[in-house]
Amino acid sequence: MGIDVAENTGEIYSNLAPREKLLAYGSVSLTDAELLAIFLRTGTRGLPVLRMAEFLLKEFGSLYHLLSADYDTFCSHKGMGLAKYAQLQAIAELAKRFFSSQFMHEDIMSSPSVTQEYLQNLLSGRDREIFVVLFLNNQNRVICHEEMFKGTINKVEVHPREIVRSAIKVNASSVILAHNHPSGHAEPSLADKIVTDKVIDACNLVGVKVLDHLVIGRQCCVSFAERGWI
């Protein structure tokens, strides 16, 4: 009849409520817990699915930390097993591919907001600094991107020669740099400016242009290009 049969009638209603809300008012009307409940589908005895979703978000602290948890950590929580772990890992990977597909076939210089949104979703919420490089062809389309350097909570060591080597390997004409600030504040530091200049100098030697450096905070990002620093 088009409706999944569940053992617990009360559980059906707790599961359907977020779906009905989504269909009536759109996905943006749902809380993180309600969206998560739709994917989890069922709770456990004494723990309806929506309460389970709320509990998981509280325990892990954020959607990012929940979706990036390893198997042992995830399954250490009541009611969490292989099936739900696989479901959430599939969700996380689909989200990554969705955002990636949005800008892989566009001239990203004509749609910078798409790039910023992608990088915001990729890096915001990470608990240590990650330095990402987007490699572009001569039509400003993304060839690939790479998380090149991983650091600590407040610094990451960047090697310009490694960026140049990767750019040559994929025949990139230009690059966009990006890294996050786990503190949540996107304002670039003096060290950020210095390393950007070093990468620009190294790339100039082989004819690769640095188009921008984006610093990602919790809710916003700062563009070096928009500030006239590149």
From Swiss-Prot:
This is UPF0758 protein plu4865. Keywords: Hydrolase, Metal-binding, Metalloprotease, Protease, Zinc. Belongs to the UPF0758 family. YicR subfamily. It comes from the Bacteria. GO terms for biological process: proteolysis. Residues 108-230 form the MPN domain. InterPro entries: MPN, RadC_JAB, RuvA_2-like, UPF0758, UPF0758_CS, UPF0758_N, UPF0758_YicR. SUPFAM superfamilies: RuvA domain 2-like. One of its GO terms (molecular function) is metal ion binding. NCBIfam families: PRK00024.1, radc. A motif (JAMM motif) lies at residues 179-192. PROSITE patterns: MPN (PS50249), UPF0758 (PS01302). Zn(2+) binds at residues 179, 181, 192.
